[in-house]
Amino acid sequence: MSRVTLSRYLIEQTRSHNTPADLRFLIEVVARACKEISHAVSKGALGGVLGSMGTENVQGEVQKKLDVMSNEILLEANEWGGHLAGMASEEMDSAYQIPGKYPKGAYLLVFDPLDGSSNIDVNVSVGTIFSVLRCPDQYLTQNDSLNEQAFLQPGTQQVAAGYAIYGPQTMLMLTLGNGVKGFTLDRELGSFVLTHDNLCVPETTAEFAINMSNQRHWEPPVKRYVDELLAGKTGPLDKDYNMRWIASMVADVHRILTRGGIFMYPRDAREPSKPGKLRLMYEANPMSFIIEQAGGAATNGTQRILDIQPESLHQRVAVFLGSKAEVERITDYHLEG
């Protein structure tokens, strides 16, 4: 049987699910950019790309050389194709305007160019997260600058989302709203090849991912839930759990997508005015879309993440996602107060 490449899969989606050709072309361009980022990441010290730039992004985080390089790769790959009305990146203060010399399209691309970049120098898996939205009609102009408001759509409006993970293999996980597919980069062929069909997150789990060093800062519902997990068979859940924490959202969520579990990044007492650490637009929404399409669930503790109306490009949010039964349990604990 011939192997199904990403290009072939997208063409088949156009035929069977009426996926617009412009969206197909956009996904292929993003995938090519991810291949280029993968190549740069794999070179590491040999390519002179490790270490920091000595600058900070809008989040106040120190930018790694590969953060900046990955951001530029995605911008340059996607700005000229005519598929996009604009882009927004975690590494940039404001929306990226498509240069006037290029035609504009009907979509918006939102991305975290290199998630988990604090792990780059120690050779731990990192990745690229992206989300595709339709640009509202009132913002579809060829000449005017794109207003940030065009991007502020709830996650339910995403038409596609995915992530590339750069590990022992480079993989692209993708949803177009009809399930989740996984593609592995065949470096000899130079293409992403379908290797994981209709991924499904198990409803129950025996694994959880959370940064335990922050335990003293958690809110009571999170402390209660994690205490029950740690109690194992002797506790109310009557089951032993294992903890896994990589400190790279892409890597942690990838494990949960492929074998189950719950990922937690709660708000805490250190910054009580902030509703969480992770970015709604660049991380939480695309990952929640993927997890839900695989049969899992994702909330901020009290509300489905995909239902949250964004108020700003860099809005933060608490995240609980993964196996449905566990996400529902900790959400219930939050709602009980």
UniProtKB/Swiss-Prot annotation:
Q: Where does substrate bind?
A: D115, G116, S117, S118, N211, K277
Q: Which UniProt keywords apply?
A: Carbohydrate metabolism, Cytoplasm, Hydrolase, Magnesium, Metal-binding
Q: Which reaction does it catalyse?
A: beta-D-fructose 1,6-bisphosphate + H2O = beta-D-fructose 6-phosphate + phosphate
Localization, per the record, is: Cytoplasm
Its needed co-factors are: Mg(2+)
Q: Which InterPro entries match?
A: FBPase_C_dom, FBPase_class-1, FBPase_N, FBPtase
The principal localisation class reads cytoplasm
Please list the residues that bind Mg(2+) 1.
Answer: E90, D112, L114
> Does Cytoplasm appear among the keywords?
yes
Organism's domain of life? Bacteria
Q: E.C. number, please? A: 3.1.3.11
Q: Name one GO cellular component term.
A: cytosol
Q: Give GO BP annotations, semicolon-separated.
A: fructose 1,6-bisphosphate metabolic process; fructose 6-phosphate metabolic process; fructose metabolic process; gluconeogenesis; sucrose biosynthetic process
Which residue ranges traverse the bilayer? none
User: What is an example of a GO molecular function annotated in this UniProt entry?
Assistant: magnesium ion binding
Q: Which residues of this UniProt protein bind Mg(2+) 2?
A: D112, D115, E283
Return the cofactor note field. Answer: Binds 2 magnesium ions per subunit.
NCBIfam families in alphabetical order: PRK09293.1-1, PRK09293.1-3, PRK09293.1-4
Assembly and partners are described as:
Homotetramer.
Q: Which HAMAP family does this UniProt record tie to the protein?
A: FBPase_class1 (MF_01855)
Family membership noted in the UniProt record: Belongs to the FBPase class 1 family.
Its protein name is: Fructose-1,6-bisphosphatase class 1
Supply the source organism for this entry.
Azotobacter vinelandii (strain DJ / ATCC BAA-1303)
Q: What is the lineage of its organism?
A: Bacteria, Pseudomonadati, Pseudomonadota, Gammaproteobacteria, Pseudomonadales
